Amino acid sequence: MSNNWKSVRLRLQNRTLVFLLVILSFGSCYSLKSQGDGFLESVTKDLWSDIDAEDLRAVGFHRKLLGRFRNPYTHLNAFRDRPVARATPPSSSVSTRPDAKRSSTLPPPQKSPPAQHVSAPPPFVHHVTLPSLTSSSKTSSNSTIPIVAGCIAGAVFILLLATGVFFFKSKAGKSVNPWRTGLSGQLQKVFITGVPKLKRSEIEAACEDFSNVIGSCPIGTLFKGTLSSGVEIAVASVATASAKEWTNNIEMQFRKKIEMLSKINHKNFVNLLGYCEEEEPFTRILVFEYASNGTVFEHLHYKESEHLDWVMRLRIAMGIAYCLDHMHGLKPPIVHSNLLSSSVQLTEDYAVKIADFNFGYLKGPSETESSTNALIDTNISETTQEDNVHSFGLLLFELMTGKLPESVQKGDSIDTGLAVFLRGKTLREMVDPTIESFDEKIENIGEVIKSCIRADAKQRPIMKEVTGRLREITGLSPDDTIPKLSPLWWAELEVLSTA
């Protein structure tokens, strides 16, 4: 729950940051618009000042003419070129010197017959005084400062936005990194905030009231379910019927198992689709992909099962190797708790799907014989990467020979299997007789087997080295070993729609 809460809190913080950035952006735009309007008003005021109006009134223009000119300077040339009627002014007329001192009123004209003396207005062009450059520059400077400040604020905003996007994107990339293969984008988004939690009623309906039992697994009973879309799923139900038998330690191990399985995410692994936990009735369930072709153990040792030819076995071996190499390469590394041929399942096209249902059952010191054994994950904590390499060597021997690694009783004889191989018998001599033809490089595979099962764990190669060596022998790439149509791609959409 803590991981889910941290993820939700991070998403809320991201959205809050984006909201604040949007508000700041709109505020900056509105501020620039207001400053622009003020700048236009100041420019208009400078171009058409009160002094200009006084000059026009002084030369006799009527006040109503002022409204006709939005900008008088655009009409100067036209006004200057107009012909002016010349009449003889009286001897006492007003001086028309260009440098005459500006006055708010004109001297009173001399009394004379109006019909004989018509005074023409002095040339308006030469008497109009331009607005003060000092005042205009101050106004322009005052108007420019907010614009420059707005531009700087916008640049800082863009820089902060780019930095924030880069930071959160890189941080999100780190959390998504374990999921980058095998899953589609839809399911990745759900897994980032936790594994989908499903309802018991939905799982019960898919499993036909839990009547479709297909086997058992270390944690309990294994059911087959079918979603409403027709996609098949595997359901592992914990064999604990009462909450009294489910301690806090077991609950912690159960959640650790979910966390571990959800991080593997490989196309050659039985991926976890979801889980269910309910108290009434007490339920602890894990939902996985379903591989329809059974296990490798069944195909090797049951006569009624489909025969595996040489190419199939090489593909199975490489699929297991690639998956284990991926698990060991995670940070921190994840090891398989109990790698056996019975834990390797096959899809419809006989691609590998490694399952890991194992928790391990141990009886507590204070428990009675009738009580349910405590479920603790001891195998996972004790198993090492070297153990996985050893188990892979044994499994590879079983694939090539069709024999169990350990000695088993077969009728009146004992099949020692691996012991004979270690005593010097070649793998070619021990190859499964059901294989009609096989590659001449089988002895090279025998060398890989011997290196994996060395008694000294420190002398065993790491899984990456084993995988590289087998790839040189078989020539199979990771894409050659994965299912052509993974059940996960279909199951995930149905799970998401019901989660």
From Swiss-Prot:
Keyword Cell membrane: yes
Cytoplasmic domain ranges by topology: 168-499
Gene Ontology, cellular component aspect: plasma membrane
The keyword Transmembrane is annotated on this UniProt entry: yes
Mode of membrane association: Single-pass type I membrane protein
Signal peptide residue numbers: 1-31
GO molecular function: ATP binding; protein kinase activity
Protein kinase domain location: 208-474
Compartment list: Cell membrane
Record Gene3D superfamilies: Phosphorylase Kinase, domain 1, Transferase(Phosphotransferase) domain 1
Sequence intervals crossing the membrane: 147-167
PROSITE patterns: PROTEIN_KINASE_DOM
Region entry Disordered, spans: 80-121
Pfam hit, one: PK_Tyr_Ser-Thr
Glycosylation, residue list: N14, N142
Keyword terms, alphabetized: Cell membrane, Glycoprotein, Membrane, Signal, Transmembrane, Transmembrane helix
InterPro entries: Kinase-like_dom_sf, Prot_kinase_dom, Ser-Thr/Tyr_kinase_cat_dom
Segments on the Extracellular side according to the record's topology features: 32-146
Domain notes: The protein kinase domain is predicted to be catalytically inactive.
Name of the molecule in the record: Probable inactive receptor-like protein kinase At3g56050
Gene source species: Arabidopsis thaliana (Mouse-ear cress)
